Amino acid sequence: MYKRQINGLIKEVTRAWELGIRCVVLFPKINDSLKTEDGAECFNEDGLIPKAIRILKKEVPEMAIMTDVALDPYSCDGHDGLVDETGNILNDETIAILKKQALTQARAGADFIGPSDMMDGRVGAIRTCLLYTSPSPRD
């Protein structure tokens, strides 16, 4: 796993393609100033991961791209889930955000969506969301 800027990412993914690697996985490392209690940056269509997906699909169109769905890289407390004032994880509210994150990644052109969070029921909820929500055409 390597931390890359977009230009470096394009170079690395192009090199990987030339070496016969046909799928890459993207994990975000965003600036701390973008982290919030609700992790809303995870579904920003102009955010780091959607932008990286669109650029990679333009530069290395045949490369399969897998993305991570999780709130912890985007939340200021680093938790996988939203946390209430008593410290309890809000499972259902978190899943609603994870579905938006997955849909944002799919709309950007991700080929595979890989949830790594720990919310109960998130895989089925994300799958249903992706099956029944028509993604807009890829840029």
Where are these regions (language model features)?
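Conserved small/polar residues in nucleotide/adenosyl-binding loops
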Residues: 1-5, 132-139
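Non-catalytic positions within long, well-ordered alpha-helices that form the structural scaffold/packing
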Residues: 14-17, 106
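Alpha-helix-loop-beta-strand connector modules within alpha/beta enzyme cores
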Residues: 39-67, 123-134
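Active-site mouth loops of central-metabolism enzymes
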Residues: 3-7, 82-96
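Conserved, mostly hydrophobic/aromatic
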Residues: 9, 68, 105, 126
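Catalytic beta/alpha-barrel core
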Residues: 94, 111-118
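Glycine-rich, proline-tolerant flexible connector loops at the mouths of alpha/beta enzymes
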Residues: 23-46, 116, 120-123
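Hydrophobic faces of well-ordered beta-strands that scaffold small-molecule active sites
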Residues: 24-26, 65-67, 113, 138
